[in-house]
Swiss-Prot record:
Temperature and activity: Optimum temperature is above 90 degrees Celsius.
UniProt xrefs under InterPro entries: Acyl-CoA_Synth/Transferase, ATP-grasp, ATP_grasp_subdomain_1
Organism listed in the record: Pyrococcus furiosus (strain ATCC 43587 / DSM 3638 / JCM 8422 / Vc1)
Protein family: Belongs to the acetate CoA ligase beta subunit family.
Protein's name in the database: Acetate--CoA ligase [ADP-forming] I subunit beta
Encoding gene per record: acdBI
Gene Ontology MF, one: ATP binding
């Protein structure tokens, strides 16, 4: 089965259940398109939370998985730097309890678990559909750069590798990525690759109205999508 058919299966299931895509589903779709994501598992109970955390390897991150909870931090649904089985058990309990308190009627699927990654340079890649031009892909540096300074670049899909490299060089904060002031430069090629693939995804899956991959951690040798949200 090709990537479009596999992604459609995930999308159709969510549509049939009249709910948004949850983080593990969004990451599964990114994986189908060759966009790197951390290895993850979804634990439905305490035992699985401990087992999967051990398999993935401490320290890990745990986040609530629920179609009704979009802003996980607001719900107290995120725990980072979990170092052992005891902490994993405790984190699972706390997250589930917090989520119940936050939204008593929410459907709680459990938690997504992935390895705590070393801090990279945070960047964002997004996609919106313009009524006139079709799918437009956005690139910017994470945190205040996008939210406050609105330092972003856009291109309409399809996007070539050259377009993607231009998008990256266009933002005012580019020197930070290029290794200004003795900082280590990040892998621009790996970022360009993600931008191109988001463009392909947008063209092949018109059911997805919006994509927000935030943050992507960019390193010297690679780039990895840490969190992802897709709107149908």
């Amino acid at each position: 089965m090709d990537r479009v058919a596999k992604a459609r299966e995930i999308i159709e299931k969510a549509k049939a259940e009249n709910r948004p895509l949850v983080e593990p589903e969004a990451k599964e779709i990114l994986k189908l398109y060759g966009i790197p994501v951390p290895e993850f598992k979804v634990a439905r109970n305490e035992e699985e939370a401990v087992k999967f955390s051990g398999e993935i390897g401490y320290p890990v991150v745990m986040k609530i998985v629920s179609p009704q909870i979009i802003h996980k931090s607001d719900a107290g649904g995120v725990k980072i730097n979990i170092k052992n089985d005891e902490e994993a058990r405790e984190a699972f309990r706390t997250i589930m309890q917090n989520a119940r308190n936050y939204k008593p009627d929410a459907d709680l699927w459990g938690v997504i678990i992935y390895r705590m990654l070393p801090l990279g340079r945070e960047v964002i890649v997004g996609m919106i559909r313009d009524p006139q031009f079709g799918p437009a892909v956005m690139f910017g540096l994470g945190g205040i750069f996008v939210e406050i300074l609105k330092d972003v670049s856009f291109r309409v899909a399809p996007i070539t590798k050259e377009d993607a490299l231009e998008m990256i060089r266009e933002i005012k904060a580019y020197p930070i990525l290029a290794g200004a002031r003795g900082e280590k430069p990040v892998n621009i090629e790996a970022l360009a690759d993600i931008i191109v693939k988001v463009g392909e995804l947008a063209l092949e899956l018109p059911e997805i109205k919006e994509i927000d991959i935030n943050p992507i951690f960019a390193y010297e040798d690679s780039a990895i999508a840490v969190d992802a949200r897709m709107i149908l």
